[in-house]
């Protein structure tokens, strides 16, 4: 089974480039919206493997709700990146204009990891 994350964000063209920088990915498939200003669907890959699909959100969402509500469940995108340098690059890129929930730290199950909500409202956990 192949599984990867789909995110719907405002400014999908910019977001896709941010995620390419963060994860060393490239856009390998893209369908633009009707006026060619955003992605209807784009696929990002690393070494030929799809890791993320990005599409334009149909309208702006109140990302601030994430900070105002107490959630009983949590969902986020988990990426094991394989090296401390890759984690640092992803963390630095994703935290630009975002909110750091957990800075890079050590856990019993991962020696170098962090959690951040990026400027598009997507929550990421990155680790080695």
Identify the role of each PLM range:
Residues 1-10, 17-117, 126-128:
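Vicinal oxygen chelate
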